Amino acid sequence: MICIFLFLGFYMQYQTTIAAIATPPGRGGVGVIRLSGPKASLIAEHLTAKTLPAARMAGFRQFYDAEGLVMDEGLVLYFPNPNSFTGEDVVELQGHGGPVIQNALLERLFELGAKAAKAGEFSMRAFENGKLDLVQAEAIADLIDATSQAAARSAVRSLQGAFSLRINQVLEKLIHLRLHVEAAIDFPEEEIDFLADGKILALLDDVRDSVQQVQTSARQGQLLREGLQVVIAGKPNAGKSSLLNALAGNERAIVTDIAGTTRDVLHERISLNGLPITLTDTAGLRETGDIVEKEGIRRAIKEIEQADLLLLVYDLSEGADPLALAQEYFAEHLEPRRLILIGNKCDLMTGHPELAQYQNFRHVTVSAKMDMGVQALIDAITAHAGFQPEEDTFIARTRHLDAMKRTQLHLHEAREQLVVFHAGELVAESLRLAQNALSEITGEFSADDLLGKIFGSFCIGK
């Protein structure tokens, strides 16, 4: 009975015809409304009082309201199933881009039987109809949201199937391995020894290496998509705001000789060597009785706790231990992988040391005001993040890396069961779980709530 209800729900969903504005809100020369579903062509013909133009050919039409009055005019394109984005009948109406006329046209389509599309519903239908896998569907949203040329190019590669191909190649190896293991379990009379010839162990290690290679590439794609949260911290007048301006390439923050000028956090989106960065300037860390400045310091510490990377700026001319401030305010977050020490105002020093390391921490000497050493700092930031994108880098998300991490965990368990315990059934179960985890990436094995969360983050018209 449950299966019948699930089938009916799926059937009813795709018997509806959906409509949405596909262009951004606001005024524009052209506004596009998209229809998809079994009644798309019928609804469009009622709207235009004419038959549709030939498939994939633009035709000029007038759009009529319920009283027969012309609401707008423009182009109509018809994409019959299955040769459309969604795999269903799709009609695109290209009229004028004013919000009033676009909303009026959309309301008219609803009167004619269309339903309002949910966020990401067009892409969801494309996924369900086999036009896209989950990685390609996500790449559409990533291409729209790309903040750099490199991110856009990587999103296009994922949309074209580069990431999916890598995952599917690993899955083929994993399925091949499972077949060998299952054969050894199902035909015990053949007395197949799991370790006799080392073949299964070699296949398992090959799969693990393949997953690791994809993980390395995906990490670069994740950095391109999600970027790095970088926080600048230090004492008042250490040159934090000057450093933000130098990295951003403009005077974003106010710079004065008065200590405590910066009292709130200041965020700036920039790109360093192609790596998207959210750069945050913070209030100077010191003891103060000023209530407003105290609140700024509290917010600064909160930003420090959440940062991917912290740039701790200190004044070289003071000769102080740069780590003393860190020990006082955020000792629990004092990790070499999250911290770069910045010795600033080197232009005021004669014969200043070019330190590359201070204790266990990376160190860079700069003059933010004079733009000395800034490129070396930029290189240090991207190197610290492990950012080394290749020409074939594809876009990736945190959930992809999480799925691969779980895949590796199950493969490690399978190896342990194989080598230590010779437990064939447990090896097979771990390999099954590894395949399920890896299949989540392309959507071959995905829970409904995961799909809803992914497509729910899309634009309405996608």
Swiss-Prot record:
Cofactor mode of binding and number, as noted: Binds 1 potassium ion per subunit.
GO CC, any one term: cytosol
Residues annotated for Mg(2+) binding in this entry: S241, T262
Residue ranges constituting the TrmE-type G domain according to the UniProt record: 227-386
Keyword Hydrolase recorded: yes
Pfam families: MMR_HSR1, MnmE_helical, TrmE_N
The protein's Enzyme Commission number: 3.6.-.-
Primary location group: cytoplasm
Annotated GO MF terms: GTP binding; GTPase activity; metal ion binding
Cofactor(s) needed: K(+)
List of residues binding K(+): N237, T256, I258, T261
This protein's UniProt keywords: Cytoplasm, GTP-binding, Hydrolase, Magnesium, Metal-binding, Nucleotide-binding, Potassium, tRNA processing
Binding site for (6S)-5-formyl-5,6,7,8-tetrahydrofolate: R34, E92, K131, K462
List of residues binding GTP: 237-242, 256-262, 281-284
HAMAP family: GTPase_MnmE
Function: Exhibits a very high intrinsic GTPase hydrolysis rate. Involved in the addition of a carboxymethylaminomethyl (cmnm) group at the wobble position (U34) of certain tRNAs, forming tRNA-cmnm(5)s(2)U34.
Family, per entry: Belongs to the TRAFAC class TrmE-Era-EngA-EngB-Septin-like GTPase superfamily. TrmE GTPase family.
Stated name of the protein: tRNA modification GTPase MnmE
Annotated organism of origin: Acinetobacter baylyi (strain ATCC 33305 / BD413 / ADP1)
Upper lineage: Bacteria, Pseudomonadati, Pseudomonadota, Gammaproteobacteria, Moraxellales
